[in-house]
C-alpha cells in the first residue's frame, strides 16, 4: 500500500509539473509577442530576385489572404561608409514595402532619433541594422556606386542574424522604389503572406498551386 501511495503521489506530481510547465510556456509566448510582419506562408527563390510582381497581385486577390508583401535582396554590394574611413567593404541591401516598413514602427524596432518617414518612396534615405558594437549612426552616409544614401534610422538589432548581432556587417533596408532604382531589379527573392483567421486548407492549397514549382513554398 505504501508503494502504491508513493507511485500515485509521484504520478500526480508529474501531472502537476507538466501542467505548470505548459502554462509557463504559454506565459513566455505571451510576454514575447510576434512581429507585426510575421508571415504564415513564405515563398522563396533560390535564384535571386526572380519572383515576378504579378504573383503578388494574383495571390492578394485569393481567398484566405490578409496581406502579401515581398522583399528583394542584394548581397555584398561594394560600399563606403563616409563617417568611417576604416570601413571600405560591402553591404547587404534588403527592400521593404510600405507594409513591412510600417511594421517596424508597430514593433518599436527602431532606435530613438530614427525618422522612418524619410525612407518611403523613391528616396536617398535608408535604415540600417545595428547592435551595441556598431560604428555607424543616424545621419551617416553610405556611398554605393554613384549614389549617396543617408542612414535615416537604426534598427535596435539585426533581424537577419540568428542572435540579433550584426557581426560587423552593415545591412541596409530600403524602400521598394529605392531598391529598384539602385539595382534595376524588380522581382522578389522572398514573398511573405499573412492569412485570415478563417483560412482553409483548400485556400492554402490554391495559393500553393499558383506558385511555380521552382520556388520553395513553406506553410508555417
Q: What positions do the PLM features span?
A:
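Alpha-helical transmembrane segments
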Residues: 5-7, 13-40
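Membrane-proximal juxtamembrane linkers immediately C-terminal to transmembrane helices
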Residues: 28-46, 86-87, 184-187
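Short beta-strand boundary microenvironments
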Residues: 39, 53-62, 66-140, 147-163, ...
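Short, surface-exposed ligand-recognition loops at beta-strand->loop->(often short) alpha-helix junctions
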Residues: 44-51, 195-199
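Small-residue transmembrane helix packing/gating motifs
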Residues: 157-198
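A cross-kingdom feature of multi-pass membrane systems that activates on extracytoplasmic/periplasmic
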Residues: 195-220
Amino acid at each position: 500500500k505504501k508503494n502504491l501511495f508513493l507511485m500515485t503521489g509521484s504520478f500526480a506530481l508529474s501531472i502537476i509539473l507538466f501542467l505548470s510547465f505548459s502554462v509557463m510556456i504559454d506565459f513566455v509566448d505571451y510576454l514575447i509577442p510576434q512581429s507585426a510582419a510575421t508571415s504564415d506562408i513564405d515563398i522563396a527563390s533560390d535564384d535571386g530576385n526572380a519572383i515576378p510582381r504579378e504573383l503578388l497581385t494574383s495571390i492578394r486577390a485569393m481567398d484566405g489572404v490578409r496581406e502579401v508583401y515581398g522583399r528583394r535582396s542584394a548581397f555584398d554590394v561594394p560600399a563606403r561608409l563616409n563617417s568611417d574611413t576604416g570601413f571600405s567593404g560591402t553591404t547587404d541591401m534588403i527592400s521593404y514595402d510600405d507594409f513591412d516598413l510600417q511594421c517596424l514602427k508597430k514593433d518599436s524596432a527602431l532606435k530613438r532619433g530614427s525618422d522612418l518617414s524619410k525612407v518611403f518612396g523613391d528616396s536617398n534615405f535608408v535604415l540600417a541594422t545595428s547592435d551595441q558594437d556598431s560604428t555607424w549612426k543616424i545621419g551617416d552616409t553610405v556611398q554605393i556606386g554613384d549614389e549617396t544614401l543617408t542612414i535615416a534610422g537604426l534598427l535596435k538589432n539585426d533581424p537577419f542574424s540568428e542572435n540579433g548581432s550584426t557581426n560587423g556587417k552593415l545591412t541596409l533596408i530600403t524602400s521598394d522604389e529605392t531598391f529598384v532604382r539602385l539595382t534595376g531589379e524588380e522581382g522578389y527573392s522572398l514573398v511573405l503572406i499573412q492569412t485570415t483567421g478563417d483560412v482553409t486548407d483548400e485556400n492554402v492549397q490554391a495559393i500553393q498551386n499558383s506558385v511555380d514549382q521552382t520556388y520553395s513554398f513553406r506553410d508555417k
